[in-house]
Amino acid sequence: MKRITKFSLLLSLVLGLYFPTVFAQSNMTNEMFDLAKLKSGVKNKRISSTDPTGGNRDHLEPFKPGEKRIIADIKGTGVINHIWVTIAPPPPTLSRNDIIIRMYWDGNDYPSVESPIGPFFGQGWDERYNYASLPLSAGPENGTGLSCYFAMPFEKGARIEIENQSDRNIDAFYFYVDYLEMAKLPKDMGRFHAWYNHNLT
């Protein structure tokens, strides 16, 4: 019995020392670890609806029904890593299903992303609610602010377009588009694609 107890204690000590080391080594490629890495040739950039006068009108002027606006037209090479928007008026006064977001990569004339803005940010059924996931979130105050953290690489430019397909004005459209600017994309980088499929099931 004493031998079994001693062996169990020894095994516990070995495992206790071994697994944290293995976990730490395997965890050295996660995003929090990457924050400490020094990166050369990479710049953090942001395009936003900020008021250029320094005032508090940090939104685009009203969109008329049927109007399209380009909110980001980025030249060169990079990776979009964050998009945030909030829109007035909120649902149900203005349906997020009637506001379309399109994204174009590398000078293409066809969109790689085309979706109503609500479903793109994870808000279905023309509803608004708070939630959080790794790539998408909505909040506070019943999901008024919408965030996307998907990585969206591009080599020869990126363009993001918003279209108002509703029968009323978008009174205010606030946004950030954050991206990394670089001379060359890392190897094996694909392109982000998303489309909206509305089928009754």
What is each residue range found by the language model?
Residues 2-3, 19, 27:
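A detector of low-complexity, intrinsically disordered, Ser/Thr/Gly/Pro/Ala-rich segments
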Residues 1-9:
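Bacterial N-terminal signal peptides that target proteins for export
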Residues 25-201:
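Beta-strand-centric surfaces of beta-sandwich/beta-rich domains
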Residues 8-21:
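Bacterial N-terminal signal peptides
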